[in-house]
């Protein structure tokens, strides 16, 4: 995550739930290999069993659909992506996952409800397998699970 505040909250939650999680403070768009991150952060394994991401996915054209309390309290950096390349973060994270997922590893994404088909196609084109598109409680496309 690019937000130190978000990572501090995530670390607090991990500690409270007694789970060990490696959180990384970096701009994913400027990272080509997770192993190449500065070792001063902490030692990262060369491969991960699970990668989970909820990247920015709300397009500017969908901004009017966002509830006021979300717009008022959520950082816009965490919500919005340019209309011209709405799958930018998914592409980058998936490319990193191809290099850094263990052979039986899984990639999970929360997705834009309007871009389920496009996100599945992106992952298929990159070579992912066992792609599952899941719906939320309202019947909207919301999550993808896949493997390499």
Regions found by a protein language model. Name each.
Residues 83-147:
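Conserved Class I SAM-dependent methyltransferase catalytic core
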Residues 20, 50, 62, 71-72, ...:
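Short, functionally important structural connectors and interaction interfaces within domains
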Residues 22-24, 77-78, 132:
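Structural signal for short hydrophobic segments within the conserved structured cores
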């Amino acid at each position: 995550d690019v937000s130190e505040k978000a990572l501090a909250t995530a670390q607090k939650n991990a500690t409270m739930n007694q789970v060990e999680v490696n959180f990384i403070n970096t701009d994913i768009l400027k990272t080509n290999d997770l192993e190449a991150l500065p070792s001063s952060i902490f030692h990262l394994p060369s491969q991960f069993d699970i990668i989970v991401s909820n990247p920015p996915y709300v397009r500017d054209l969908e901004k009017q659909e966002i509830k006021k309390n979300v717009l008022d309290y959520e950082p816009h950096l965490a919500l919005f992506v340019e209309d011209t390349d709405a799958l930018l973060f998914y592409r980058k994270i998936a490319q990193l996952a191809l290099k850094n997922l263990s052979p039986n590893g899984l990639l999970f994404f929360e997705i834009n409800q309007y871009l389920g088909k496009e996100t599945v196609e992106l992952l298929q084109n990159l070579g992912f397998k066992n792609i599952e598109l899941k719906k939320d409680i309202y019947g909207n496309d919301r999550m993808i699970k896949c493997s390499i």
